[in-house]
């Protein structure tokens, strides 16, 4: 009996902030591995989500959105996005269903230098009239350089099957790199820290969310059978610390409640979550601190 062909490869998700890269990856792997919010720069690190079927295994690399850097952290995030193109088999350039803007034009120009196939993926098509979508697709066709132009909705699942089938056509034959039940290459503590940061993004406003970082200090079994997780939320100013803690500790308590629910859903077990808030002045422009909390710039040099 002839052995069934199996394909595998790495696919980078690229695009401006908040275009839906993390939402698409979470939909594809069937579980939250990348956090989402309506605020730009939600994703900071390269995160991989693993999709496995009987035909192929795809490692999707969700990158930070590309934008003009204003700090060491911003610079790190842009380099993380571009470095992800060095060792992938395909690039999915994600855009929203609107006329080509300067940001998308900038990224499209960068992608002309890429040696691997680039797909243009127009997300959020459930929010636009089909006739307008056709005009937008036509304007992107004129840019050239895209092997495929695919309309999808990452929230509604529209066009996802077609996207996966098209990816399969371009992937090389290869082995299954990860177990069928593995959905990310990141350790649990990384995803846990991201889930806590997601709740900060969702519950606080203005500059506070992007002035925060989360580090998991320990994950140990406790006597009561629950998993004990201790984490520190870092902010840049005393005033931000006050906002995170809230009046009478209410905000920090709500962050903890919401985070614990998400973490328990991820890990499938009861969790005792303890949170602390500390001030680390100008941490976003401190290379040694960035490295300490997981932003290792060596791999980007």
Swiss-Prot record:
GO terms for molecular function: GTP binding; GTPase activity; ribosomal small subunit binding; small ribosomal subunit rRNA binding. Residues 41-45 are annotated as: G2. It is a peripheral membrane protein. The keyword Nucleotide-binding applies. It holds the Pfam family KH_2. GO terms for biological process: ribosomal small subunit assembly. Monomer. NCBIfam families: era, PRK00089.1, small_GTP. Belongs to the TRAFAC class TrmE-Era-EngA-EngB-Septin-like GTPase superfamily. Era GTPase family. This is GTPase Era. The gene is era.
